[in-house]
Amino acid sequence: MKPELNDKHEKIVSIPLVKGLIITLWGILALVLFQSAHLFLIRSFGILNLLVATLTIWFIVQRPYLKISGQWLKLEAGIELAAGIVFTFLVYTPVDFIYYISIGIFFIIILQFIYGYALLNTGVYNVPNLVMRFVTLMSGVVVGVTLFSGMVGFSQAFLVVGVFSFVYGIINIRYGLTLKSDVLGTIK
């Protein structure tokens, strides 16, 4: 049964808003602790990914009527779950963190490109949303290449990822605040 859609935020849980808050929180932690608490940052990154994956799965289960958006959300939840498991249980060193985070950034960039292209092909898009996707995509390429090539040390890598997370989180918060309905993509 499909719930009635409305223009008010009181009846919907905006997953991009919650994700944005979590990503921004981790970005702030990374900016504050980038020199001293590498293992804490790695573990907290993994745990927060597990939390976000759980929220996304809950959102999908509550809204089985979502079609294309639901498919993308399932993929997103799978990626978040995998990242949560890897960073919580398998990564112990900054070297491994930098390696896996750069691969993750490249993977997310590819998905952003595919999703943006799919939106363009369907004619369902919002120009500011596409511009933000492009900016995120380009900055993600720069961050991913910088990390993967080893151009920065461990502390600087955490700083770079922290800044990227902070900005990406703010973009998600902005997107989450502008959603009019839980059929992701309907924007004011």
Q: How should each PLM-predicted stretch be described?
A:
Residues A83-R133:
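Membrane-proximal helix-loop-helix units in multi-pass membrane proteins
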Residues D7-L21, P64-A77, L120-L137, S155-A157, ...:
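Cytoplasm-facing juxtamembrane segments at the starts of transmembrane helices
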Residues A37-L51, V95-F107, F158-V163:
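Structural signature of hydrophobic alpha-helical transmembrane segments
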Residues M1-W58, L177-K188:
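N-terminal topogenic module of multi-pass integral membrane proteins
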Residues I22-L29, L48-L55, I79-V86, G104-Y115, ...:
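Membrane-embedded alpha-helical transmembrane segments of multi-pass integral membrane proteins
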Residues V143-K188:
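Hydrophobic secondary-structure block in the mid-to-C-terminal portion of proteins
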Residues A83-T93, L137-F154:
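Hydrophobic alpha-helical transmembrane segments in multi-pass integral membrane proteins
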Residues P3-E4, T54-K67, F113-N121, N172-L179:
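C-terminal ends of transmembrane helices
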